[in-house]
Amino acid sequence: MSEGDLFLISFLKVGFASLGLNEQLINNIKRYGITKLTPFQMEVIKEIKENSNVIVDSIEGTGRTISLIIGTLDKIDETKQQQEQEQQERQQTDQQFSFPQILMILPTKELSQTTKVIYSSLGGGENNNNDFKVLSCIGGVKISMDIEILKKGNTQILLGTPGRISDLFSRKRFDTDNIKILVFDELDEILSRGFECQLEDIIKPLNNNNNLQIIVSTSGINELTSNFINTFIKIPKIIKSQQEPYKF
């Protein structure tokens, strides 16, 4: 299939089997109303599942965020055995922590909240009851409220704006060792808003984890995004789409 191909694949007939998604996620996707994926979206999900560092370069409206959410959700460790063991060890002290597996940085409060809703809808268990917690941390909300939720220890997907996530990093309010996927959604927009220092504060300590997978979405690669990618992301797979915005 050529890059930017506009024809659609029937997700219900082909995509589930070819992508190897877990059954509960498939059921949630159906319930959410997604019936088709483009070849571009399928390629994004495939590369995420294969643990590649991925740069998704496409205009808005091509379904890239849905692709990121589906791909990362499929990699959640649902057994949570390691998380629960570590949490029990932490509970022997005065501090309690969450052990998020996915950390996603977004440019705006609105996008963070919208993405949280989609993660919650696609990540729910039977009858759409979440077996894990999705937390959106944004400015304008008291940070003490975020900290109280993180102390409960069940946050597996952490979303937020750069300033708030950087603040939580500096306060050491969640365990970073369990993070296996770091996502920068709309990196070009994040950098254009002047958050480069905050992104560095977030990514530098995580880069010590050799198993960390980094995923970026961007609408074009300019000097700012190119410098960031070259500095912090090892051997990324670039997936580029030139197709027109697609509506489900």
From Swiss-Prot:
Residues 45-239 form the Helicase ATP-binding domain. Keywords: ATP-binding, Helicase, Hydrolase, Nucleotide-binding. ATP binds at S58, I59, E60, G61, T62, G63, R64, T65. InterPro entries: DEAD/DEAH_box_helicase_dom, Helicase_ATP-bd, P-loop_NTPase, RNA_helicase_DEAD_Q_motif. It comes from the Eukaryota. The keyword Ribosomal protein does not apply. GO terms for cellular component: cytoplasmic stress granule; P-body. It holds the Pfam family DEAD. GO terms for molecular function: ATP binding; hydrolase activity; mRNA binding; RNA helicase activity. A motif (DEAD box) lies at residues 185-188. One of its GO terms (biological process) is P-body assembly. SUPFAM superfamilies: P-loop containing nucleoside triphosphate hydrolases (SSF52540). A motif (Q motif) lies at residues 14-42. Belongs to the DEAD box helicase family. eIF4A subfamily. This is Putative eukaryotic initiation factor 4A-like protein.
